[in-house]
């Protein structure tokens, strides 16, 4: 279970948790499964909460970190949380690969006041609210601004876990994503009555800028630029991943194209 930490400077803990178990990735298969050899030599099967190819991050033989959470309600007692990958700054960088954690990270950053400058003061946060043209989509976070805010429109906020790094440029997506394309269209649809915000959750500390992954999904790149023109805001948030905590590493600027 993670614990939110009060706001602080860059590099300060945002979430803390019991130390993760380290091991070496043997293989990933069937998208949701990964075999890992622990330090003890035991080989365990972990749940992989990431359906993408994890470009530049998936390295059999590389170091990984797992969370041990046995429960009668879970088929697997282990969850793959982090992977060590080559860093654009030289050396290696720990990357957060659990996409299910991204929403909690962004919510914690908002509650800690890290996004107040760009979002304004927030009075309430509601997760997974139904919206869209056919009411079949769910927005990750629906924010209600403080009554004294200069812009009191509701804020529809979509989060995208981002792990792909090319020369310090964080890129999303790393594969064709019709779901991601749909989310951009839905964000455009709430304008101008509401604010629409895309938040790339940059789950590695070694990136300096965010851009759409045009080479992986050209259509997503086109829709991304259309969304910017329509008034969708993009707020990339960067985090550092450690064995027992996740740190706030600040906001990052956005490029409109990968090249």
Swiss-Prot record:
It comes from the Bacteria. Disulfide bonds: none annotated. GO terms for molecular function: DNA binding. It holds the Pfam family SfsA_N. Belongs to the SfsA family. HAMAP family: SfsA. This is Sugar fermentation stimulation protein homolog. It comes from Prochlorococcus marinus (strain MIT 9303).
